[in-house]
Amino acid sequence: MCSIFYPNYYVEDVFSIDYEKLMSMGYKALIFDIDNTLVPHGADSTNAVDELFAKLNDMGMKTLLLSNNNQARIERFKKSFHTLYIEEAGKPHPQCYHMAVEMLEVKPNEVMVVGDQLFTDILGANRAGLESILVKYIGYYKKEKKGIRRNLEKVLLWFYGHSSRSKRMPSITIDNS
């Protein structure tokens, strides 16, 4: 029952993902959430994120931002790098994930979804038949508002951590200098 909310992998952050390993496993594209996955909610991109997307592009990995944000927010976020995107996506509906796969021009088994929320990013990926990586939520900790969903996520993550499906990806450090 809870497994529809479980990611295939769980890591600290987007910089802990071994992208070379993903490529060696046959993945050709990544679908990223923005807020609280790549940067705190509403924040502009950082040099580290810009460098990550440049590295992924240099590796030949296709990328797409899948966000429930509007176009202006996404355009502002990605002003320093090129990537495809879908705005006002309607996550967790599987249709937006299918559209993303089409835009990336890859097969569903060649895509990995990266996000911070079980109830949108991971649920949507699972419903669309895509694999996923859950990253820990990035937030402004002093202003952090913990809603019911975040508290439910903690409970589900406890069950995930005690399930046979629980996997952590081997990590690498992306040089941020």
Which ranges hold each PLM region?
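Asp-based, Mg2+/Mn2+-dependent phosphohydrolase catalytic module
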Residues: 2-32, 38-177
